[in-house]
C-alpha cells in the first residue's frame, strides 16, 4: 500500500503550508489564505485556538458564516490542482493519504486531497453549489 504524507513532514507539494495559489493576483500558501479568511466577533484574525465567528471572502471581501470555511478550503485545493494537474495525476498513484496533524483542526488536507483524487470533477461541482462559491459569483 502506497501512502502519501500530505503535510510539511511529507511531500511538501501536498502541504497547505507550501502549496501556493493566487487570488486576485496575490500568491500565498493555502494555509495562509485559509487562516487569513478567519475572523473573530470583532472582525480581526483570531489567535491560535480562538473562536472563529465568521469568514471574509478574499475574492470579494464579503462577510460569510464560519461554516463556509470548509468550502473555501476545498476551493483553494481545487485551484491548486487546476493549476498543477500533474500533481493530481501523481497523487492518483497512491492508495491512502495521511496527515500527521489530522484532528487538530476541522479541515484536513489529506482528506481534501483524497477527495480530489477520487472525484475531482464531482468535488468541484459540489463546491460550485456552495454558499461560498455563490457569493464569489454574486448570486
Model-assigned labels for residue ranges:
Residues 1-35:
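N-terminal accessory segments that precede or flank the first globular/catalytic domain
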Residues 39-101, 116-136:
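Long, contiguous internal "core" modules enriched in hydrophobic/ aromatic residues
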Residues 102-116:
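Active-site nucleophilic cysteine motif
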Amino acid at each position: 500500500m502506497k501512502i502519501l504524507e500530505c503535510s510539511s513532514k511529507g511531500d511538501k507539494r501536498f502541504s497547505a503550508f507550501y502549496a501556493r495559489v493566487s487570488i486576485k493576483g496575490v500568491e500565498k500558501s493555502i494555509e495562509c489564505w485559509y487562516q487569513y479568511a478567519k475572523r473573530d466577533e470583532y472582525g480581526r484574525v483570531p489567535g491560535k485556538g480562538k473562536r472563529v465567528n465568521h469568514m471574509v471572502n478574499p475574492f470579494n471581501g464579503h462577510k460569510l458564516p464560519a461554516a463556509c470555511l470548509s468550502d473555501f478550503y476545498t476551493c483553494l485545493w481545487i485551484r491548486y490542482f487546476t493549476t498543477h494537474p500533474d500533481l493530481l495525476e501523481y497523487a492518483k498513484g497512491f492508495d491512502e493519504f495521511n496527515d500527521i496533524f489530522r484532528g487538530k483542526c476541522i479541515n484536513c488536507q489529506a482528506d481534501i486531497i483524497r477527495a480530489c483524487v477520487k472525484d475531482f470533477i464531482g468535488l468541484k461541482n459540489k463546491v460550485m453549489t456552495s454558499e461560498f462559491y455563490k457569493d464569489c459569483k454574486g448570486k
